[in-house]
Amino acid sequence: MNTLLFKRKGGNCGNESNIVSQGSPSSSNLPESPGTLDEKNLPRLPTPFARSLSTIPSYEQMKRTNKLPDYHLKIVVVGDGAVGKTCLLISYVQGTFPTDYIPTIFENYVTNIEGPNGQIIELALWDTAGQEEYSRLRPLSYTNADVLMVCYSVGSKTSLKNVEDLWFPEVKHFCPSTPIMLVGLKSDLYEADNLSDLVEPSSAESLAKRLGAFAHIQCSARLKENIDEVFETAIHTLLSDSLYAPREPTHTIKNPFKRNTTRSDIDSSTGDTSVSISGTKRLRKNKCIIM
């Protein structure tokens, strides 16, 4: 049920007789001859609603009560269906392991983490569908991606083969300059006895180097092993210069809808802006832009 903008304070608009008895002029009060009635002598109907203005906090109030993130990173996760992409994200964001498999079309998760010097980093994690029928919709997720995680399951050699045949060509086509890391999921399967059916770590490592991935990490969402390492590696690769650089005072332009930017970072020809720290400038240049 939608919240009403106006709250009812008194009166009864559902009972017509009640309204008439309280506010309608009786026959004894009517003038005996037709004429113009004096407005100030007319009785008034009771007001059934009284307006109540909602309290909307100003930007300055929100800034005082909630610290705005210093950085915003968008990470897009791709790979074959059922390799464990959703479990990876839920395990990282919520700390739980989902037991039921529900195919994902598109799903977004947002979480804030704290950097080594107290910086607030907002992560926007985009889960995508690996099924072929969604191949035309999937590129919509790549816009403004800062990191691409191409995933495979250690229990499926086919999913690793598709990394080379399908996923790297696709993300390289749409995001040629965006950093890509290779992530192996379900590493807890190595505890089983049928190791011959599993992906050999050395094969995945050599593939990552050959394809130009900046990192290759295997993890287990069920056991929560190496989950944090996956995302910390992505963050440090992008923001290592920014997170550990000393903060220098700068003259900033206040904008309530965007992160503060320095005047020297505004391109007069295009109006584009970038934050003043060198690491984030590099991040903007490598951001995926879908034309």
Curated annotation (Swiss-Prot):
SMART domains: RAB (SM00175), RAN (SM00176), RAS (SM00173), RHO (SM00174). Pfam families: Ras. GO terms for cellular component: cell periphery; cellular bud neck; cytosol; endoplasmic reticulum; incipient cellular bud site; plasma membrane. Keywords: Cell membrane, GTP-binding, Hydrolase, Lipoprotein, Membrane, Methylation, Nucleotide-binding, Phosphoprotein, Prenylation. Its EC number is 3.6.5.2. It is a lipid-anchor. The modification Cysteine methyl ester is found at residue 288. It comes from the Eukaryota. GTP binds at residues 79-86, 127-131, 185-188. Residues 14-31 have a biased composition (Polar residues). GO terms for molecular function: GTP binding; GTPase activity; protein kinase binding. Residues 14-45, 250-273 are annotated as: Disordered. A lipid is attached at residue 288 (S-farnesyl cysteine). SUPFAM superfamilies: P-loop containing nucleoside triphosphate hydrolases. Gene3D superfamilies: P-loop containing nucleotide triphosphate hydrolases. A motif (Effector region) lies at residues 101-109. GO terms for biological process: actin filament organization; maintenance of cell polarity; positive regulation of formin-nucleated actin cable assembly; regulation of actin cytoskeleton organization; regulation of formin-nucleated actin cable assembly; signal transduction; small GTPase-mediated signal transduction. The modification Phosphoserine is found at residues 264, 268, 276. It is an enzyme of class 3 (hydrolase). Residues 289-291 form a propeptide. Interacts with BEM4. Plays an important role in cell growth. Required to keep the uninucleated state. May be involved in the organization of the cytoskeleton which affects microtubule functions. Most likely RHO3 and RHO4 of S.cerevisiae regulate partially overlapping but different pathways. Belongs to the small GTPase superfamily. Rho family. This is GTP-binding protein RHO4. It comes from Saccharomyces cerevisiae (strain ATCC 204508 / S288c). The lineage of its organism: Eukaryota, Fungi, Dikarya, Ascomycota, Saccharomycotina.
